[in-house]
A protein has these predicted regions:
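Conserved AMP-binding/adenylate-forming
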Residues: 1-4, 8-27, 31-124, 131-133, ...
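Conserved nucleotide-binding/hydrolysis micro-motifs of P-loop NTPases
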Residues: 7, 32, 183, 215-216
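Conserved beta-strand termini and adjacent loop/short-helix elements that scaffold enzyme active sites
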Residues: 27, 63-65, 162-164, 211-213, ...
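Residues at the N-termini of beta-strands
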Residues: 82, 157-158, 207
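AMP-binding/adenylate-forming catalytic core of the ANL superfamily
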Residues: 87, 92-93, 101, 107, ...
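Conserved short beta-strand edge segments in small beta-sheet-based binding/regulatory domains
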Residues: 199-210, 246-247, 283-298
Length: 298
């Protein structure tokens, strides 16, 4: 069976195989690569979590790209970078010339806007989307749709939307807002306002968080990586609290060159729930983010 559109948790891949006797082979592609760019083959190793190897006559290159869309250098093995495509399966360009700006670092190399890494054997591993798309159940959501709706509220100064891990849909949109100075409004009111002003139902934020100040870069742009970390942390906290009500966890979200994001869990008060270690894999099986338990006993 083939699968695409969004990353699938390893636990779901394994469960499907156990129940049906059939393997799911994850692949990757887009309209610009005539649907398919990589796949798992019937021969050789099938690496669960990767999207396979390039198809014949297709080249995939991982590179560091500057803000103007130019190649800085090629990434090392297992180093995360922009996924570039070339070959007979790659389209020659968009009809609207403005859409071609910054997506062709070289004449024959198309920048997909996705981020990933190639391992030693040429398997591709997706780790993120450079353009911040939120994928909810295979449905691509432009965060700008969510942000524009919230920004239309008279008491909202600025809004930013990111994807939060979700056990059912893979990701769901959540929003962070900074209010106009002196304004008072509840998070539920903002969530209702957004829902009523977004025509695309899937883009309505499931949660809205009011922040004193949103994180920004040195040039004043909203720094979404920090907001994603907050969203991931909240999702893990919710799952852990539901499963281990008597155990207190500290979560540390770290950047990882190979994995993208790594979630470090530290149990600081088990209060009799010493068996939580054996239960963690089941509780967190739907998360695609890599996580590790910090052993504080040694």
């Amino acid at each position: 069976c083939g699968c695409g559109a969004a990353p699938m948790p390893v636990s779901l891949l394994e469960s499907f195989a156990q129940r049906t006797g059939a393997d799911i082979m994850e692949g990757y592609g887009m309209t610009e690569t005539i649907a398919v760019a990589t796949t798992h083959y019937f021969f050789g190793d099938r690496k669960i979590g990767s999207v396979g190897m390039r198809i014949p006559y297709q080249t995939i290159r991982i590179a560091n790209i500057d803000d103007n869309g130019n190649i800085i250098d090629d990434c090392d093995t297992n180093e995360i970078g922009a996924i570039l495509h070339s070959g007979i399966s790659t389209f020659p360009g968009y009809k609207q010339q403005e859409a071609n700006l910054a997506v062709w670092p070289k004449n024959d190399l198309f920048n997909s806007g996705d981020m990933g890494r190639l391992d030693e054997e040429g398997y591709l591993w997706l780790v993120g989307r450079a353009k911040d798309l939120i994928i909810r159940g295979g449905h691509n959501i432009d965060p700008l749709v969510t942000e524009d709706a919230l920004a239309a509220h008279p008491l909202v100064e600025v809004a930013a939307a990111v994807g939060r891990p979700d056990t059912h849909s893979g990701e769901v949109p959540v929003a962070f807002v900074q209010l106009v100075e002196g304004a008072t409004v509840s998070e539920n009111e903002l969530k209702t306002f957004a829902r009523d002003h977004i025509g695309e139902r899937a883009a309505a934020p499931v949660d809205v968080t009011i922040c004193d100040v949103l994180p920004v870069t040195a040039v004043g742009k909203i720094y979404k990586p920090e907001l994603r970390k907050r969203a991931i942390k909240a999702a893990f906290h919710t799952a852990l609290k539901a499963a281990f009500s008597e155990t207190e966890f500290m979560l540390h979200i770290a950047d990882d060159k190979r994995l993208g994001i790594k979630v470090m869990l530290e149990a600081i008060d088990t209060d009799g729930q010493d068996d939580f270690r054996s239960q963690l894999p089941e509780v967190l099986k739907h998360f695609t983010q890599h996580w590790e338990l910090i052993d504080t006993n040694g």
